[in-house]
A protein has these predicted regions:
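Membrane-proximal intracellular helices of multi-pass ion channels
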Residues: 1-445
Length: 445
């Protein structure tokens, strides 16, 4: 048996996921280093190529070079492929090639596909994977067609490529854009702040990509019968609606007071959708108030939903923590939502994920603030954007040193593969003790 196969047999699911994502990132970085990937046909420094490849595979959107003005058509195509692989997941994309080639999917592969999709069971996972691939490509195609007239009007024939690229980037919640120029880099979609077609299409793609593949399947199976949905789908759809509506009202009333009513509404809606977790922007985040930035950090931290293209701690994690708090207030033993009781493991996992992401984002912000002598609040914005795989920035990332960029690379990688995945992979060899220790009460609060 070849050595690589022996190694693969020894790896558990969590370790193999990490290695596959790392391999795709390194291959992407190697391609981006090539002179053909840059507009000026020069070699891009490896650390910049690695940062960009990590951001693409982890569907983040933080960049150190402007995507449109630095990368050539080849480089942009590489980025789009990396975004697609990162958005759908390495295992999902790999399984799709197996399905296309007619190869039989083994039981171990089905188990990995189940984990990648966050599916409740192995049964029907091949059918679900095929549905996800077909639906993803269809939605991206529809998104590109919707934006095509606007971009072709403004850019001519090259507008076709821009429509396709932005559709893939939006659906995969990546946030990479092709709007910058050498004179005006990193402008994102600010030129389209009042354009309803671009705003609504990008927003719709972000939301659909961020609600999760299982939610799609639930809606397809049960149509609009909300009461028939799985508990997870109910929580995701409710949380998503609230996390769009409430921030939109805040931005409308307190942040965006200039311009026409339509422009204010589009700005408010877009800035409530994109932090979870796309990274496009139609407004300058440096012009927001401290409260507006704080709300954006909170939205980035929560992110999208499990089994989706989005990052963050996930809407379900936030919902379980809130439900558990209400259960404590009411002196209930278990949190409840929609007439169902939460399992204890979900509460423990939610608390662990919240703690891990909070500690990592704060630690990263402290280190970057110290190394770069920058305000802590601005560094926290960047680190939260990285670990939640968002891509929004206050303009700091392109000017950070190699150490600080390395921290952001680590946070982006953690955010995409999952904090618990990293922990489980690291502790795979350890065995938990079966002994039950004596219990003792400790006062909290």
């Amino acid at each position: 048996m070849p050595s690589y196969r022996r190694l693969a047999c020894k790896l558990n699911y969590f370790q193999s996921i990490i290695l596959m994502f790392a391999a795709v990132i390194l291959i992407g970085a190697a391609l981006l280093v090539l002179p053909i990937s840059a507009q000026e046909r020069t070699v891009t420094p490896f650390h910049e190529a690695l940062f960009t490849a990590t951001s693409a595979v982890c569907v983040t959107g933080l960049v150190v070079r402007d995507t449109a003005s630095h990368w050539s058509a080849f480089g942009q195509a590489v980025l789009m492929v990396l975004i697609q692989i990162g958005g759908l997941g390495v295992i999902t994309v790999g399984a799709s090639f197996s399905l296309l080639s007619g190869r039989r999917i083994s039981l171990s592969q089905r188990g990995r596909m189940q984990e990648a999709m966050s599916a409740p069971k192995v049964g029907g996972i091949v059918r679900l994977t095929g549905f996800v691939i077909r639906t993803s490509l269809m939605i991206e195609g529809i998104g590109a067609l919707c934006m095509l007239p606007v971009f072709c009007r403004d850019f001519g024939v090259s507008g076709i490529w821009k429509a396709v690229f932005h559709s893939v980037s939006a659906f995969c919640n990546a946030g990479f854009d092709l709007m910058g120029t050498p004179d005006m880099p990193f402008v994102s979609l600010t030129a389209y702040r009042a354009d309803p077609v671009i705003n609504l299409t990008i927003s719709a793609l972000i939301v659909v990509g961020g609600v999760g593949f299982l939610t799609w399947d639930d809606v397809r199976t049960n149509r609009l019968c909300f009461h028939r949905y799985r508990l997870q789908s109910k929580v995701i759809l409710t949380a998503t609606a609230l996390l769009i509506l409430l921030p939109t009202l805040y931005f409308l009333w307190f942040e965006f007071k200039g311009g026409t009513q339509r422009e204010r509404l589009l700005l408010s809606l877009f800035q409530s959708v994109t932090p979870r977790t796309a990274g496009f922007n139609t407004a300058d985040y440096t012009s927001l108030s401290s409260s507006g930035r704080g709300l954006t950090i909170l939205l980035m931290f929560i992110g999208g939903s499990p089994g989706s293209t989005a990052g963050g701690i996930k809407t379900t994690t936030a919902a379980v923590l809130v439900a558990n708090a209400f259960a404590v207030f009411r002196r209930q033993k278990s949190p409840e939502m929609f007439g169902r009781r939460m399992e204890e493991k979900a509460v423990h996992d939610a608390a662990a994920i919240f703690t891990l992401y909070l500690v990592l984002s704060l630690t990263g912000a402290f280190v970057i603030s110290t190394v770069e002598t920058l305000p802590l609040s601005e560094c926290l914005f960047e680190t939260t954007s990285a670990i939640a795989t968002v891509g929004l920035s206050l303009g700091l990332t392109p000017h950070l040193g190699i150490v600080s960029q390395g921290i952001l690379i680590f946070l982006m990688f953690i955010g995409r593969v999952g904090g618990l995945t990293m922990i489980y992979a690291a502790l795979s060899g350890s065995k938990s003790s079966a002994a039950r220790l004596p219990q003792e009460r400790i006062t909290v609060g």
